[in-house]
From Swiss-Prot:
Biological role: Involved in ligand-dependent receptor mediated endocytosis of the EGF and insulin receptors as part of the Ral signaling pathway. By controlling growth factor receptors endocytosis may regulate cell survival. Through ASAP1 may regulate cell adhesion and migration.
Alphabetical list of InterPro entries matching this protein: EF-hand-dom_pair (IPR011992), EF_Hand_1_Ca_BS (IPR018247), EF_hand_dom (IPR002048), EH_dom (IPR000261)
Modified residues annotated as Phosphoserine in this record: S254, S493
Biased amino acid composition, Low complexity: 582-594
Name used for this protein in its record: RalBP1-associated Eps domain-containing protein 2
Phosphothreonine modified-residue sites: T479
Record keywords, A-Z: Calcium, Coiled coil, Cytoplasm, Metal-binding, Phosphoprotein, Repeat
Region annotation Disordered: where it falls in the sequence: 169-208, 433-616
Cell compartments where the protein resides: Cytoplasm
Post-translational modification: Tyrosine-phosphorylated upon stimulation of cells with EGF. Phosphorylation on Tyr-residues induces its association with the EGF receptor probably indirectly through an adapter like GRB2.
Gene: REPS2
Coiled-coil region: 601-657
Region (Interaction with ASAP1) location: 561-660
Length: 660
């Protein structure tokens, strides 16, 4: 029944071709494969309005296709799925005669399919082109309600071919018997993915000579399982599918195409973007390949490792260099997981015949790919892994949640080798609360933590606003976290506190304002008022000095011996140990002041070091490219030289002998 319907359709198309196209086109000659494929497509388009895309072809349309017409909507969708320009499709519609007669009969439909195949093969869209032997047309369609696949057998072993019915179940083309399994294993699979050597076994490469001059869609890349025909292939008499002498016809081997339909991703996109869109299965495969090179997905792959991996794809060095330039968005000589996926996808596309884009497509941008990764693995893992590696007292905190309670907690920390009473603690808290501004919103991360974080590539900078910037704004510097107590000379700590303590009253001398009022204390600690007052001499001018002084002047200030401050009276010796408490409180700003110039210098040096490393990597890559190019040119030179010698020998033999 099917063969009769196909023959009737072909006969009707061939008989009506002369009148269907206007000015006497040549007779429409179809091979058996084209007859079966075209009649099947016509039946689907004719029955799409009634049966829907998931139903099989109606029997009425298949038995008598000459009496049916294809619905305009399904035909338009099918033609758009050829991915030809709208102008070309309009020209095909005019040439096939459908625009003149007002409908798509079998004749117009078949001629249009031949013209689509000619346009996809690079031939001009003319009626004369349908005389040539052409491959079957290729279509790529998308449906939101489900996945629909049109499939052809992987390879033709004879002159008869059967096209599977339309199905809406993913991977639902089933084998009918063991004979089909043998045929499928001996036929090349139709997955268009040509992955590097480290791909899993089911990612099989399809040679470009087998009909894949381009990727049809990004969806096809990651569906490795072959889509088998529902019905067994019909073999000509006297031949067997498993015989070693069986070879497909040469022209039919180039006719085979697999046109598939993949469900669109979450956001709709135009057809030109589809090849550059990474599917879920592709992303999973790329991530697995990345983890084989770098177990930590939040880390990166160095340029040398990526180079050794990608050169296995056998692409030329200039193409690989261009892919690297496209994918390495931040130009740091290393690939993160999104950049690796983009580079891998570009290499796979190039291996399958797609020309490389002029710029990185939007669907391969690192921001787009990073948003597609699961958040627990990508957004939080870098920070969590770093926090786990630090001791408990050095872990970074949330920089936007600094409260006064943290300052008070710092004040509550016991000072070694000291007997601090509760009243002393309250006094110290009040002093700190007066010194600090009300709207402190930054965490006092140490320069050590800041530098260690900056030294890690691609990680966020958790460092707070520098002391120099805070002083320029006239604000007080953030209090550093507690450090192991160090012995500071009294004069040194006093001198450093001139610069970094806020403007508060100091001593009671005639030259300086009186000290701040402190809560009452027991008698043994009354001298703390004097010691704390002496810790803050001449502080009213500190902010202006800090705003005007440059780092160079501060360095000079630190290198000079500290000058003795004006004292109101001499302290007894038994109060020397008690004075260590405010000295310890001042040691934090003193240490911060000593280390203040270092973050800027280290930041500059780290930037310079990173720039030098990037330049070294780029030079090494360029050197490798030039070395390979040099070897290729040397080989060509050697071949040309040998050719020249051979030609000279031939010329010498052909030259007539001159007799003197």
């Amino acid at each position: 029944m099917e063969a009769a319907a196909a023959a009737a359709a072909a006969a009707a198309a061939a008989a009506a071709a002369g009148g269907g196209c206007g000015s006497g086109p040549p007779p429409l000659l179809l091979s058996e494969g084209e007859q079966q494929c075209y009649s099947e497509l016509f039946a689907r388009c004719a029955g799409a309005a009634g049966g829907g895309p998931g139903s099989g072809p109606p029997e009425a349309a298949r038995v008598a296709p000459g009496t049916a017409t294809a619905a305009a909507g399904p035909v338009a969708d099918l033609f758009r799925a050829s991915q030809l320009p709208a102008e070309t499709l309009h020209q095909i519609t005019e040439l096939c005669g459908a625009k003149r007669v007002g409908y798509f009969g079998p004749t117009q439909f078949y001629i249009a399919l031949k013209l689509i195949a000619a346009a996809q093969s690079g031939l001009p869209v003319r009626i004369e082109s349908i005389k040539c032997e052409l491959p079957l047309p290729r279509f790529m369609m998308s449906k939101n309600d489900g996945e629909i696949r049109f499939g052809n057998p992987a390879e033709l072993h004879g002159t008869k071919v059967q096209i599977p019915y339309l199905t809406t179940e993913k991977n639902s083309f089933k084998r009918m018997d063991d004979e089909d399994k043998q045929q499928e294993t001996q036929s090349p699979t139709m997955s268009p993915l040509a992955s590097p050597p480290s791909s899993p076994p089911h990612y099989q490469r399809v040679p470009l000579s087998h009909g894949y001059s381009k990727l049809r869609s990004s969806a096809e890349q990651m569906h490795p399982a072959p889509y088998e025909a529902r019905q067994p292939l019909v073999q000509p008499e006297g031949s067997s599918s498993g015989g070693p002498g069986t070879k497909p016809l040469r022209h039919q081997a180039s006719l085979i195409r697999s046109f598939s339909v993949e469900r669109e991703l979450q956001d709709n996109s135009s057809y030109p973007d589809e090849p550059w869109r990474i599917t879920e299965e592709q992303r999973e495969y790329y991530v697995n390949q990345f983890r084989s090179l770098q177990p930590d997905p939040s880390s990166f792959i160095s340029g040398s490792v990526a180079k050794n991996f990608f050169t296995k794809s056998k692409l030329s060095i200039p193409e690989l260099s261009y892919i690297w330039e496209l994918s390495d968005a931040d130009c740091d000589g290393a690939l993160t997981l999104p950049e690796f996926c983009a580079a891998f996808h570009l290499i796979v596309a190039r291996k399958n015949g797609y020309p490389l884009p002029e710029g990185l497509p939007p669907t391969l941008q690192p921001e787009y790919l990073q948003a597609a990764f699961p958040k627990p693995k990508w957004d939080c893992q870098l920070f969590d892994s770093y926090s786990e590696s630090l001791p408990a007292n050095q872990q970074p905190r949330d920089l936007n949640r600094m409260e006064k309670t943290s300052v008070k907690d710092m004040a509550d920390l016991p000072v070694p080798n000291q007997d601090v009473t509760s009243d002393d603690k309250q006094a110290l808290k009040s002093t700190i609360n007066e010194a600090l501004p009300k709207d402190v919103s930054e965490d006092p991360a140490t320069p050590k933590d800041s530098n260690s974080l900056k030294a890690r590539p691609r990680s966020r900078s958790y460092s707070s606003t520098s002391i120099e910037e805070a002083m320029k704004r006239g604000e007080d510097p953030p209090t550093p976290p507690p450090r192991p107590q160090k012995t500071h000379s009294r004069a040194s700590s006093l001198d450093l506190n001139k610069v970094f303590q806020p403007s508060v009253p100091a001593t009671k001398s005639g030259l300086l304002p009186p000290p701040p009022a402190l809560p009452p204390r027991p008698c043994p600690s009354q001298s703390e008022q004097v010691s704390e007052a002496e810790l803050l001499p001449q502080l009213s001018r500190a902010p202006s000095q800090a705003a005007e002084s440059s780092p160079a002047k501060k360095d000079v200030l630190y290198s000079q011996p500290p000058s003795k401050p004006i004292r109101r009276k001499f302290r007894p010796e038994n109060q020397a140990t008690e004075n260590q408490e405010p000295s310890t409180a001042a040691s934090g700003p003193a240490s911060a002041a000593t280390m203040k110039p270092h973050p800027t210098v280290q930041k500059q040096s780290s930037k310079q070091k990173k720039a030098i490393q990037t330049a070294i990597r780029k030079n090494k890559e360029a050197n490798a490219v030039l070395a390979r190019l040099n070897s290729e040119l040397q080989q060509q030179l050697k071949e040309v030289h040998q050719e020249r010698i051979a030609l000279e020998n031939q010329l010498e033999q052909l030259r007539p002998v001159t007799v003197l």
